[in-house]
Amino acid sequence: MLAFNFFGATEGGLFDINATLPLMAIQVVALTYILNSLFFKPVGNVVEKREKFVSNNVIEAKNKLSEVKKLEADLLTQLQSARTEAQRIVSEAEDESDKLYKEALELANNEANASKEKARLEIESQTSAARDQLSKQADVLSELIVNRLILEK
């Protein structure tokens, strides 16, 4: 007993081995079981449900993001093809417009040349007719002049 007094331990201390120690152990086990069944399991279930919910939402968000990226790529492809098609249509329209302009210009030139040629031929015809008429009138006048000169003599 002298050895125990030397370290300052007395009877009835913290680590006395008697019936209190097993009773405390049983209380700790019972408290652990009660806390586990009443508090930790429901909280754990709620945490697991929340983790599953978050995990499912993350997976769903990743899937939707993947789908959005795919749709964006498809739309960009469609936009590029639409732009190419629009450029092709504009180019064709410009070519058609140029072609129609050239055809209209050529037609107008041909009509102008035809009108000019027709007017030239008409002028030549009228000039020729006027010369013929003048020639006939000159013949008639010269005959008259000759007749008068002959008669006056």
From Swiss-Prot:
Its main location: membrane. SUPFAM superfamilies: F1F0 ATP synthase subunit B, membrane domain. Keywords: ATP synthesis, CF(0), Hydrogen ion transport, Ion transport, Membrane, Thylakoid, Transmembrane, Transmembrane helix, Transport. One of its GO terms (cellular component) is plasma membrane-derived thylakoid membrane. It is a single-pass membrane protein. F(1)F(0) ATP synthase produces ATP from ADP in the presence of a proton or sodium gradient. F-type ATPases consist of two structural domains, F(1) containing the extramembraneous catalytic core and F(0) containing the membrane proton channel, linked together by a central stalk and a peripheral stalk. During catalysis, ATP synthesis in the catalytic domain of F(1) is coupled via a rotary mechanism of the central stalk subunits to proton translocation. Belongs to the ATPase B chain family. F-type ATPases have 2 components, F(1) - the catalytic core - and F(0) - the membrane proton channel. F(1) has five subunits: alpha(3), beta(3), gamma(1), delta(1), epsilon(1). F(0) has four main subunits: a(1), b(1), b'(1) and c(10-14). The alpha and beta chains form an alternating ring which encloses part of the gamma chain. F(1) is attached to F(0) by a central stalk formed by the gamma and epsilon chains, while a peripheral stalk is formed by the delta, b and b' chains. This is ATP synthase subunit b'. It comes from Prochlorococcus marinus (strain MIT 9301). The lineage of its organism: Bacteria, Bacillati, Cyanobacteriota, Cyanophyceae, Synechococcales.
